[in-house]
Amino acid sequence: ITPYVSESPLSVMGRELPQYIQEKGREIRTFMPKWGNINERRNQLHEVIRLSGMNLIIDDTDHPLIIKVASIQSARMQVYFIDNDDYFLHRQMVADEEGNEYADNDERAIFYARGVLETVKKLRWCPEIIHCHGWMSAFAGMYIKKAYNDEPSFRDSKVVYSTYGDDFQHPIEPGLGARAMLKGLEQKDLDVLNGI
């Protein structure tokens, strides 16, 4: 989302669409990963202690969920940042400065999707529409409809997913289905992931 990352079709859409919806009188929440190239000091990010502190387990490893927030003053919008030192600290979006894709991009996407959903639960917010943008949010729709389907925050939510280009050049590591497993999902829900 601009101004936190450089301008691209996805970052501009992530900035302008929520503002437009908010200006039409709707309540919005905007989330994005706290990429390593986002300057916390310049953008005035600060941790939200009441939302942070949970651990998410991915592939039998605990990963602390840290929630930060900043405001886009000109739009009167808050942006929530999903953060974790293992997945986002000192790391760019898809690949490092030399163009090498991160081997754990799948786990980063799982962590981000689950982090957003757990934060929405803690906020006790019931969104009518959840608009997922790009590869990082790809797991959110499946989790909402299968693993979080009885959760009051998501029971009546509709999910829209927008894709943007093909950022990946290398296939996802084998075993993605096992890493994405959550209570409420069945193996058949994840079998398609193992062939990616």
What is each of the regions a protein language model found here?
Residues 1-196:
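Catalytic cores of nucleotide-sugar-dependent glycosyltransferases that transfer UDP/GDP/TDP-activated
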